[in-house]
UniProtKB/Swiss-Prot annotation:
It holds the Pfam family NAD_kinase_C. Disulfide bonds: none annotated. It is found in: Cytoplasm. The lineage of its organism: Archaea, Methanobacteriati, Methanobacteriota, Stenosarchaea group, Halobacteria. This is NAD kinase. PANTHER family: BIFUNCTIONAL NADP PHOSPHATASE_NAD KINASE, NAD KINASE. The keyword Chloroplast does not apply. SUPFAM superfamilies: NAD kinase/diacylglycerol kinase-like (SSF111331). Involved in the regulation of the intracellular balance of NAD and NADP, and is a key enzyme in the biosynthesis of NADP. Catalyzes specifically the phosphorylation on 2'-hydroxyl of the adenosine moiety of NAD to yield NADP.
Length: 283
């Protein structure tokens, strides 16, 4: 079997742990690959150079049997984009993390235990979490685990656009706003929360629609996870659709964007995160 490792860039703790993990995994007879950035960082440091395994682009991590993310939620989202349906286990390096459940001091033993379980049974112990697919006329973005944002070219005075939001063909809201955000429960603690959207427990089967500087004062709405959400963007020179804050598509209004549950969920491996314990770190 093959384990992929993606470590947070410019973080010595993450690279040191990645080096240790590479050494331990070799003792289990598992093959190890790291993403190209991690390989470069390990190779540039004398103490870690011997641990450098094969490297591969993050987009090829789906060929692994397990992917390990070491860092924060941003690193996890980056790794998850390439992992596809491959189970992914997140190691949290201390900041508020709602996707990374494993403490660094427990990481090596937890990963080794999961690898041995896969070697013995042929599959990982996982929990499926929905992702979002945003698409338009002849285009679609890579799936988002946290949120999809649709907005005008810029925010603030003189920016934004007219936004019409439909849920399963029924009009929910219409008017001027900076944009609209559609989040999964997993992403409710991220950008959604900063836009005054609600916290939603990750086990709830729903999607969250939150207006961004919405002049209509429309409250956020939680809909069924299988709802189809359509955002019509007009009255703006340009707009943008963003998946998990990283992958973006520039659009020219009028544009009709569909956001719905992606066909392939993310599969979380390892012990589950205690949601309410993680919430304490937000205070």
């Amino acid at each position: 079997m093959t384990v992929g490792i993606v470590a947070q860039r410019d973080n010595d703790r993450a690279m040191s742990l990645a080096s240790t993990l590479c050494d331990r995994l070799r003792a289990t007879s598992a093959a190890v690959v790291v993403d190209e950035t991690t390989a470069g960082a390990l190779g540039d440091h004398d103490a870690w150079e011997a641990a450098v395994p094969d490297s591969a682009p993050v987009d090829e991590m789906s060929a692994c049997n397990l992917v390990v993310s070491i860092g924060g939620d941003g690193t996890f989202l980056y790794a998850a984009r390439g992992a596809g349906s491959t189970p992914i286990l997140g190691v949290n390096l201390g900041e508020v993390g709602f996707l990374n459940a494993i403490a660094p001091e427990e990481a090596v033993e937890t990963v080794v235990a999961e690898v041995e379980h896969i070697q013995k049974t042929g599959s990982a112990r996982t929990r499926a979490k929905p992702r979002l697919q945003a698409s338009g006329d002849n285009w679609e973005l890579s799936p988002a685990l946290n949120e999809v944002v649709v907005q005008g070219e810029r925010r603030g005075h003189g920016g934004g656009a007219t936004v019409d939001v439909y849920v399963d063909d029924s009009l929910y809201t219409s008017g001027h706003a900076d944009g609209v955000l559609v989040a999964t429960p997993t992403g409710s603690t991220a950008y959604n929360l900063s836009e005054r959207g609600p916290l939603v427990h990750p086990d709830v089967a729903g999607l969250i629609i939150t207006g961004m500087a919405d002049e209509m004062g429309t409250p956020p709405l939680v809909v069924d996870v299988d709802s189809e959400i359509v955002v019509e963007l007009t009255d703006a020179d340009s707009g943008v659709v963003v998946s998990d804050g990283r992958v973006r598509k520039d659009v020219v209004p009028p544009e009709r964007i569909t956001v719905s549950r992606a066909g392939e969920p993310v599969r979380l491996a390892g012990p589950p995160l205690d949601f309410f314990t993680a919430l304490d770190k937000l205070a």
